[in-house]
Amino acid sequence: MHKIAEVEIQNDILIANKKLAKRNQRLLDKAGVFAIDFLGAVGSGKTTLIEKLIERMDYSIGVIAGDIISKFDAERIKRHKIPVVGLNTGKECHLDAHLVEHGLEDLPLDKIDLLFIENVGNLICPVDFDLGSHMRIVIISATEGDDTVQKHPLIFKEADLVIINKIDLADAVGADVDKMVDDASKINPHVKVIKTSLKDDKGIDDVIEAILEAI
């Protein structure tokens, strides 16, 4: 009986979140803002990717940076002199539409073309929680192991773009990057997969091109 009640509560939470996500997207559409949700594990390169995009893209960009406790990533991104809102999720391992709604209230949407939402570092929790973004980018690193895609199929099934980062370290950790690409393509045949080494700027232009195609 308790399990049934728990499932019903979870379903209610997801339904309510979906409604809020749609409201967020309507607000973004009205303001002419294209929003991207960046998902990936801790250390995959989400913040580095966002910084590279800020430096290279000729757009007015704002950022919502989610984290469980600290606002380290938000402070790091603020160095680029753009609007940034840091959101703490407390014990939750993902952002949700309600938190993002509050984040949007603190951003000058009339002065932003692109909104980057950096989700909490996790490959499982964020999957079911739509934020109202127009695009989902999943970034993983070769150092996480070449079975990472197989272990987390749902997040790749929902991705609009997949990035495999730190390919320069693949040999050192014994990771087969081509296998990771193949696994992602099998789970989501329509998704584009880009290999990057962000510390060397390798692949960043391909990422920008993919984003521009989606806008």
Language-model-derived ranges and their functions:
Residues 70-74, 148-152, 176-183:
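Short, glycine/polar-rich helix-capping loops at beta-to-alpha or helix-loop-helix junctions
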